[in-house]
């Protein structure tokens, strides 16, 4: 299997679309922005890009094994590259790997590494760097990518610029796996990440986690033609949505992520601002309960919570309609393996009350929320509380600090607010969050049936059967796991009309968090 389709790929029963289109481009749309005129512009050098973003904290690190949100992803891609990049339509495309192929069965892969690429230090990229970089996330490590790399049994150097990866069982989606944002390519032997030594377009100038990150363009031509255009980039941490919007409107920043949906209609009337909206690929918003902890061990209690939330009311009021209904699992409607038959549970206070009574729960319920998790988290929690009251269920909403939320609250407390970003394949979406050994299994859900289904689906050659297996996987998660996923949001970015390159993307906002690399000023 290669990014140039080969007989080996054909023998797997996969056509080019099936091989590379990890997320169908269903729902991609850019709204309100005057893109036809922009499309005529050609990239040019110069200027200072000022970003105002949500999705980071004072505990952020430059170590790629620690990343968990948009700001670390964004600054990391200024300095480093990956083997595989995901394009705007969700295809796996070459980055530092110029091509790849697999033997029939997809258990053995060969990646050909680009030649003539240098790190900031002047070192030339080679196979040893690639092997070391992947192995940072294998073995004894706390990296969230450990789980998705667990099937790898061996990474072997075939030549100075060729690497062979062998797996326990085949996985037709391995190129997508290697696009995980933790898997940055660093020089062999790197242990100190405080001074990024990468193959990216920029070098680090100033590092103030929780405040700002400043980078400048490297001297000479970046190895990607037309990219890495800004003289420098200033990324500011602006966690408050109103403050981000104000910074954009007043010209203090050139682009922001995660616009408050309530302000979008007004912003779209501003002739100096473009709003980029991407449907069906945005964050999955919800609440997660640890199902191995009381009282959430009770399946009936979880059903009470799932029937006791008024999803539409939250979407209409908190997200101003810029979201689709969530069905308690995180494979989104833009994925080709999405189970469209799995409908979201309608708000049913009577049914919620029935399951709550059946659960026999005497413990008080508490959900921890923070707008540091996502803008609207607190309001969503309060509306959840109100909808549960109609079922006779009492739940306290505890507001907590956004600083350190992902370190101190998420996966630590029994019930809390959460959002999940999009992954390029259903397998990655499920494996990261819901498999028994997943590093970010934030509900502590363990299902041998689910584990077996997902692992089997990776090597299933019949596309129809594979779709059925992922559909059943989603059903199991929706019915049995500890997530109340009430919405799949639209991605909503805002930018100055002078800025180019902020386009809809099948995975993440801010053009897959690569705006610093892809953008330029008109």
Where on the chain are the PLM-derived regions?
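Structural transition elements
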Residues: 38, 325-358, 374-377
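Extracytoplasmic/peripheral linker and loop segments enriched in polar/acidic and small residues
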Residues: 390, 394-405, 431-497, 522
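N-terminal lobe/hinge region of extracytoplasmic solute-binding protein
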Residues: 52-104, 135, 197-198
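Ligand-site clamp/hinge motif
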Residues: 220-266, 386, 394
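Long beta-strand-rich cores associated with HINT superfamily self-processing modules
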Residues: 495-522
């Amino acid at each position: 299997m290669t990014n140039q389709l080969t007989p080996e790929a054909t023998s797997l029963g996969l056509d080019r679309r099936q091989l590379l289109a990890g997320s169908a481009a269903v729902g991609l749309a850019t709204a309100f922005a005057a893109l036809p005129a922009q499309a005529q512009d050609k990239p040019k050098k110069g200027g200072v890009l000022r970003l105002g973003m949500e999705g980071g904290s004072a505990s952020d690190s430059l170590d790629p094994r620690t990343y968990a949100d948009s700001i670390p992803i964004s600054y990391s891609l200024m300095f480093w590259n990956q083997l595989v990049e995901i394009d705007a339509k969700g295809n796996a495309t070459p980055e530092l790997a110029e091509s790849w192929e697999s033997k029939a069965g997809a258990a053995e892969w060969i990646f050909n590494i680009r030649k003539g690429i240098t790190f900031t230090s002047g070192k030339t990229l080679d196979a040893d760097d690639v092997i070391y970089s992947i192995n940072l996330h294998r073995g004894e490590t706390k990296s969230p990518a450990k789980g998705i790399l667990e099937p790898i049994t061996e990474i072997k150097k075939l030549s100075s610029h060729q690497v062979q990866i062998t797996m326990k069982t085949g996985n037709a989606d391995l190129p997508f796996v290697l696009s995980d944002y933790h898997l940055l390519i660093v020089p062999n032997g790197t242990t100190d990440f405080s001074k990024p030594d990468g193959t990216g377009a920029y070098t680090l100038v100033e590092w103030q986690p929780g405040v700002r990150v400043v980078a400048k363009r490297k001297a000479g031509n970046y190895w990607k033609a037309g990219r890495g255009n800004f003289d420098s980039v200033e990324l500011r941490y602006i966690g408050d949505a109103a403050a981000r919007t104000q910074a954009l409107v007043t010209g203090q920043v050139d682009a922001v992520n995660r616009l408050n949906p309530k302000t979008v209609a007004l912003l779209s009337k501003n002739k100096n601002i473009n709003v980029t909206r991407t449907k069906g690929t945005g964050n999955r918003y919800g609440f997660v309960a640890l199902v191995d902890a009381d009282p959430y061990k009770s399946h009936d209690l979880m059903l009470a919570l799932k029937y006791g939330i008024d999803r539409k009311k939250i979407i209409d009021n908190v997200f101003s309609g810029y979201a689709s209904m969530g069905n308690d699992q995180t494979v989104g409607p833009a994925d080709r393996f999405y189970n469209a038959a799995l409908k979201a549970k309608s708000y049913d206070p009577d049914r919620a009350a029935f399951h709550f009574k059946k659960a026999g729960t005497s413990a008080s319920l508490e959900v921890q929320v923070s707008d540091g998790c996502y803008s609207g988290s607190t309001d969503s929690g309060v509306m959840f509380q109100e909808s549960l009251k109609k079922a006779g269920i009492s739940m306290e909403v505890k507001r907590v600090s956004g600083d350190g939320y992902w370190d101190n609250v998420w996966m630590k407390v029994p019930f809390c607010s959460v959002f999940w970003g999009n992954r390029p394949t259903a397998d990655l979406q499920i494996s990261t969050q819901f498999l028994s050994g997943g590093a970010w299994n934030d509900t502590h859900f363990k299902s041998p049936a689910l584990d077996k289904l997902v692992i089997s689906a990776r090597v299933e050659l019949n596309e129809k059967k594979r779709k059925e297996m992922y559909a059943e996987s989603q059903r199991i998660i929706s019915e049995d796991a500890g997530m109340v996923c009430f919405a799949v949001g639209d991605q909503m970015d805002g930018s100055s009309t002078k800025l180019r390159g902020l386009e809809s993307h099948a995975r993440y906002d801010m053009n897959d968090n690569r705006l610093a690399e892809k953008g330029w000023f008109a």
